């Protein structure tokens, strides 16, 4: 689930929220390949882009290759580590790299990974998180023409409880206008 490579240079680059530790090998994600929005919870009570990045840097592929860092494209805070409802884009989004969030090659390559801080098996996301997520999902779905049926929870692509039983996925999907 690692990613390597860079987006072709087509303008000014923004400074990543967290820069990867390893250089890419030239793999590129063509424009227009985003087809899914994959929603996750961190499974923790607190967290930030930086803390998840450090944790994910410790992970390795089956062949021993280290991950570049944070697996997601966006993180939404809950007030413990990041402001409640704060949305941060990670280096994967800023450089248009595929994710390492889904445990499935297709959904890593074609899915935008969005992680909300919290464990939604135990507590529901905050209203601020849900408002921020609805806004983000609506904007991304419109920009990349992603239909609401392709706004999914992580559990749709891998056997997991993520994003948790208390996560209101249907409400998020309904925020995306019908095509």
Residue spans of the language-model regions?
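Short, conserved "active-site rim" segments that organize catalytic pockets and cofactor/ligand binding
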Residues: 25-95
């Amino acid at each position: 689930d690692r990613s390597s490579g860079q987006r072709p240079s087509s303008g000014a680059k923004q400074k990543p929220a967290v820069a990867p530790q390893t250089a890419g090998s030239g793999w590129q994600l063509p424009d227009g390949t985003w087809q899914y929005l994959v929603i996750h919870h961190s499974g923790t009570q607190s967290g930030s882009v930086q803390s998840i990045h450090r944790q994910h840097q410790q992970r390795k592929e089956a062949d021993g290759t280290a991950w570049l860092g944070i697996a997601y494209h966006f993180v939404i805070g809950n007030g413990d580590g990041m402001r409640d409802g704060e949305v941060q884009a990670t280096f994967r989004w800023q450089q248009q790299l595929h994710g390492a969030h889904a445990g499935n090659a297709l959904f890593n390559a074609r899915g935008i990974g969005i992680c909300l801080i919290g464990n939604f098996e135990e507590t529901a996301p905050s209203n601020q998180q849900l408002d921020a997520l609805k806004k983000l999902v609506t904007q991304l779905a419109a920009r990349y023409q992603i239909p609401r049926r392709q706004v999914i929870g992580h559990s749709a692509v891998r056997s997991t409880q993520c994003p948790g039983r208390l996560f209101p996925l249907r409400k998020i999907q309904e925020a995306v206008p019908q095509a």
